[in-house]
Amino acid sequence: MTRSVWLKADSEVGDWETRKRRITAGIEAGVDWVLVDEEDVDRVSELGEINIAAFTNGDVHVMEAEAEDSEADATIVGKDGEGDGTVDLPSDFSGSADLSTLRQNGAAPDGGYVRIFDEDYEAFAEAVAAEADFTIVIGENWQIIPLENLIARVGEETDLIAGVRTAEDARTAYETLELGADGVLLDTDEVDEIRKTVEVRDEMGRESLDLEYAEVTAIEQTGSADRVCIDTGSLMEHDEGMLVGSMARGLFFVHAETAESPYVASRPFRVNAGAVHAYVRTPDGGTKYLSELQSGDEVQIVDANGRTREAIVGRAKIEKRPMFRVQAETEDSDRIETLLQNAETIKVHTQDGRTAVTDLEPGDEILIHHEDTATHFGERIEESIIEK
């Protein structure tokens, strides 16, 4: 599931300058959507590239006129209506103005906004979810229980967006009933809280890999080859690197160049990944040849515990360098190998931690990621392929 962060920036937030500061902070932090009033759409679009959702009053004639001029990516009904309690809920939802608006052909809104005051509004939110692409729910007195109920009942009918005020609230919403909300609507002016919420979103979307140790069975000099350094647009931590190897089923953990040495400065944005033929793991679970990498591509950063995140390639630097062939054997006797540059700055991960490839010896245990699948054009497939 891809999670999203929405930022509330309508007239309830304050005057335009206040809303503008909030929206700008959201764009800089990397939120996915801003929720604004219809009259703000044009000037919000001038602030930067962002998905814009706009409250609409639900009048079909006004909506049709607005649709011709508006640049909103989605329209939301419910503000100043039944959804936020301005208009009383009808005893029979078949008479609901908000639901009727959502059911219109043509210029119908894309989503509904509901404040959960009690069980009646919870039921109303469920009815909205049956009609809307996006269902935004704001818990007034209770937050977790109504959200749990809606997650259990709504399923995949709609993108369920839960109102929150902090990053920790967002984490709870994302984790509720394990499935969690599809997104959160954040209501805060705190820049740090906006950034932390985006970080929580990213964390929730990260893959966690099972890494294991394989025994080094051979390490030998092989002469020169075209070696690739992957220079990313991200700074990596001391325990981070990438998964690379000659065989997609068995990839070696290679550390980023974060360590200082007397002879060369650290390059914490770089992984010296090996020869051009090798694979590197990508965020979608596939692989790419090192020779194919170019600026703008996505690669997967992984730490020694298997936690992952994405990074953008800024540059792939190819140079002829002397190489080592590193061969290892997994617990189930599968042989894997790769070519790594013969240099002290290239570090793999052994039971002793960061270890220079020049210090590796047969019998050492080296950190890898092993899968019982082959790849075809970078996609995992169930097929018998011999690689040697």
Swiss-Prot record:
Keyword Oxidoreductase on entry: yes
Gene Ontology terms: biological process: amino acid biosynthetic process; aromatic amino acid family biosynthetic process
Keyword field: Amino-acid biosynthesis, Aromatic amino acid biosynthesis, NAD, Oxidoreductase
Superkingdom, taxonomy of origin: Archaea
GO molecular function terms noted in the UniProt entry: 3-dehydroquinate synthase activity; dehydroquinate synthase activity; NAD binding
Reactions catalysed: 2-amino-2,3,7-trideoxy-D-lyxo-hept-6-ulosonate + NAD(+) + H2O = 3-dehydroquinate + NH4(+) + NADH + H(+)
Family the entry assigns: Belongs to the archaeal-type DHQ synthase family.
HAMAP family associated with the record: Arch_DHQ_synthase
Job description of the protein: Catalyzes the oxidative deamination and cyclization of 2-amino-3,7-dideoxy-D-threo-hept-6-ulosonic acid (ADH) to yield 3-dehydroquinate (DHQ), which is fed into the canonical shikimic pathway of aromatic amino acid biosynthesis.
NCBIfam families the UniProt entry points to: PRK02290.1-1
Protein name according to UniProt: 3-dehydroquinate synthase
Species classification: Archaea, Methanobacteriati, Methanobacteriota, Stenosarchaea group, Halobacteria
Gene that encodes it: aroB'
